[in-house]
């Protein structure tokens, strides 16, 4: 991780590196706020960076992952306690935050009405 940050810093320079980090922080804060505004969802912990998870006490998050995948959004499935969905943010996510949140809200509403459950599996990779 340190080597990757150093390489990015070398490529973009200090001003570019700081601008990139401002963009990433904006993406993370917008997404976190949007997720927490959807009834039933909460972000796990108080993440300071761009890799974190969210869960729900009201919805089956594996069903949420299935439904989001049907809309071409792929979330990491965490078979933890509580089960959660994992996001890894990059600058390419900046223009799609609102689209993602719209789809997540629609999926949450549909699952809340239907009681749909999802496949209990993780999608870890090596």
What are these regions (language model features)?
Residues 7-11, 41-46:
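Short low-complexity stretches enriched in small and charged residues
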Residues 1-2:
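Mobile "lid/hinge" segments at catalytic clefts and subdomain interfaces of large enzymes
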Residues 5-29:
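Structural signature of PLP-dependent enzymes
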Residues 18-21, 28-32, 37-39, 46-126:
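Non-catalytic terminal extensions of PLP-dependent enzymes
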């Amino acid at each position: 991780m340190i080597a990757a940050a150093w390489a990015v810093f070398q490529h973009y320079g200090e001003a570019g590196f700081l601008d990139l980090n401002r963009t990433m922080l904006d993406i993370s804060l917008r997404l976190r706020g949007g997720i927490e505004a959807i009834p039933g969802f909460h972000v796990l912990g108080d993440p300071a960076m761009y890799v974190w998870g969210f869960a729900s006490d009201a919805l089956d998050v594996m069903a949420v992952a299935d439904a989001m995948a049907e809309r071409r959004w792929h979330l990491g499935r965490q078979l933890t306690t509580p089960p959660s969905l994992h996001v890894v943010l990059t600058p390419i996510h900046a223009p799609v935050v609102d689209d993602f949140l719209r789809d997540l809200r629609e999926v949450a509403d549909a699952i809340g009405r239907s009681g749909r459950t999802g496949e209990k599996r993780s999608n870890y990779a090596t």
